[in-house]
């Protein structure tokens, strides 16, 4: 009973979402924050559209985030669909979104967290809830479902899967231990930079940028 009370009635102190995903979501979807974030993303996305129109290429969007804290877990669904909405408003369909999601165990080696079972439990609960939601929205095209978010000036509605591809990034290593946070994040950064900058030669002798492989992991 006490565990249930603490889960549904968290005590909020200081700033941030305090590992409470409902607060993290509210921080994004309130009118002022939502429009501010959308405006910033629109500027970047419209620039990308203008550049790719010249080359007849795709716009590839990478979203890297954790889903164990209140902020990441709370925003993980609405932020990608904000991106979908921006492309839809621009009438642009030649784009893909790749999600790289850090699982909760990535943070387990942080000294201040490792010694606190309550925080670990919160991180695991947030991660589980977020991953269940991602799993659902990865298949809405097949189930004919929709994402629908009421906002101040109407609704954000999309029938597209949340990501074109989704990769989960764990903190565990091959020996069963947990890497330090900077090691896990550094390896993903190195991997993505290699993919974004490397060029391969196809069988037909055509130069192909390896960045296309970033989105080949379907689900």
Each model region followed by its residue ranges:
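Subunit-assembly interface segments of extracellular/virion macromolecular structures
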Residues: 60-61, 82
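Gly/Ser/Thr-rich loops at beta-strand to alpha-helix junctions
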Residues: 65-77
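A glycine- and small-aliphatic-rich helix-loop capping segment at beta-alpha/alpha-beta transitions
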Residues: 77-89
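Terminal, contiguous helix-loop blocks that mediate binding/assembly
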Residues: 1-59, 67, 88-219
